[in-house]
Design a protein with these regions (language model features):
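Active-site glycine-rich loops that stabilize anionic/oxyanionic intermediates
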Residues: 1-6
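Catalytic nucleophile-loop/oxyanion-hole region of alpha/beta-hydrolase
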Residues: 7-17, 28-61
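Active-site loop/turn elements of alpha/beta-hydrolase fold enzymes
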Residues: 25, 32-34, 100, 169-171
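Primarily recognizes the serine-hydrolase "nucleophile elbow" in alpha/beta-hydrolase
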Residues: 49-112
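Active-site catalytic pocket residues across diverse enzymes, especially alpha/beta-hydrolases
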Residues: 81-85, 161, 185
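The feature captures the conserved acid-bearing segment of alpha/beta-hydrolase catalytic domains
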Residues: 94-109, 120-156
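C-terminal catalytic histidine-bearing segment of alpha/beta-hydrolase fold enzymes
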Residues: 151, 155, 162-195
Length: 195
């Protein structure tokens, strides 16, 4: 889920599971510890610990999706330093990152860093753009009406991971780019989960 790693939980976003559920997919929406009590590296580890338990509940491919900070976390799960168990990494079928944060360096100078407590080393280590591109489909969707910083983040990831499928959604902004997740007939879900 989004919230700049500082706010929110799965309950705020559970309605977005409707599209995948209607297509017959199992869906898990984990919450995670929040900053400032946690650091971003710790949040990444928390999701990496939760993912095997969630995936063990079902067979078949695993698709990861996230929005904003959650998009960052979904992308991080495909980075080799996270160390997902091999059997789980082999099940990863696709990642859908909606308005993700892919390079955390700009956050070092922002007031919110008082809560995030990022230093340059952690910002680099936690930035997907500084890790090798995974060998699986990565879809990034960002709203055309987003703030320029979110458009930049999507473009930086597409540059760093050249096989990324980037969609700039006309008329969408940071808070409604996620809406197609709840529609089982959405082209976004076709691209992510298959027709």
């Amino acid at each position: 889920h989004g919230g700049f790693w500082r706010m929110g939980d799965r309950a705020l976003w559970s309605h977005l599971a409707a599209g995948a559920l209607a297509r017959g997919h199992a869906v898990a929406l984990p919450s995670y510890p929040l900053c400032p009590e946690a650091r971003i590296a710790g949040i990444t580890r928390s999701i990496a610990r939760a993912l095997p338990a969630m995936a063990a509940e079902v067979d078949g491919p695993v698709h990861l999706a996230g929005h904003s900070a959650g998009g960052h976390l979904a992308l991080r799960m495909a980075c080799p330093d996270v160390g997902l168990p091999g059997h789980l990494a082999a099940r990863l079928a696709a990642i859908l990152a909606l308005s993700p944060l892919a390079d955390l360096a700009p956050l070092l100078e922002m007031p919110m860093n008082a809560d995030l407590r990022l230093d340059p080393a952690e910002a680099r280590a936690e930035s997907p753009v500084h890790h090798p591109a995974p060998d699986l489909p990565v879809l990034v969707e960002v709203g055309a009406e987003e703030r320029p910083a979110f458009l930049d983040q999507a473009l930086w990831l597409a540059d760093a991971w050249p096989d990324t499928h980037l969609t700039i959604a006309a008329g969408r902004h940071h808070f409604d780019v996620i809406a197609p997740l709840s529609d089982p007939a959405s082209p976004m879900l076709d691209r992510f989960l298959g027709p």
